[in-house]
Amino acid sequence: MAAVAVLLVLIGAMAGWLGWHTFRDTQTQRLHDLFLQTGRQGAVNLTTMNFEHVDADIQRVLDISAGAFYEDFQKRARAFGDVVKKTQSMTEGTITEAGIESISGDSARVLVAVAVKTSNLAAPQQLPRLWRMRIDVQKIGQIAKVTNVGFVA
């Protein structure tokens, strides 16, 4: 009888341990997915602009941004929008690849490859440009925001 009780305790402990690890792995995967999706969306928002609704496009970038990147982009938004309108620029970014470079606590660095189609008054049809971006993302509450953007050579 005592052996059965010990066996049941061991089985319960093992089930609890496996359950905890499964839960932790699921949470880690969700965080990974959140960081990756935010990095991808940040790249699309930054590379997709249209002079006809550039103010809404700029707001999309601001909505997914935080920290120093948000402040810097907000300061430059009016001048940027004016240039986009003046040149009648249209850009459309398409993600070709994306992956997590590193994760540390509530932040991650995401590498994103983007093909960007561009047209404007001076050059109506241009070949797509291929950009590689390094996007820093931070979890704030239940969402993640872009905190820094750089280009990879």
Segments predicted by a language model, with ranges:
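Amphipathic, hydrophobic N-terminal targeting peptides for secretion and organelle import
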Residues: 1-24
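Aliphatic-rich helix starts adjacent to a transmembrane/signal segment
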Residues: 25-29
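Core segments of small alpha/beta cavity-forming domains
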Residues: 30-86, 90
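A short, acidic/glycine-rich surface segment
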Residues: 44-45, 118-123
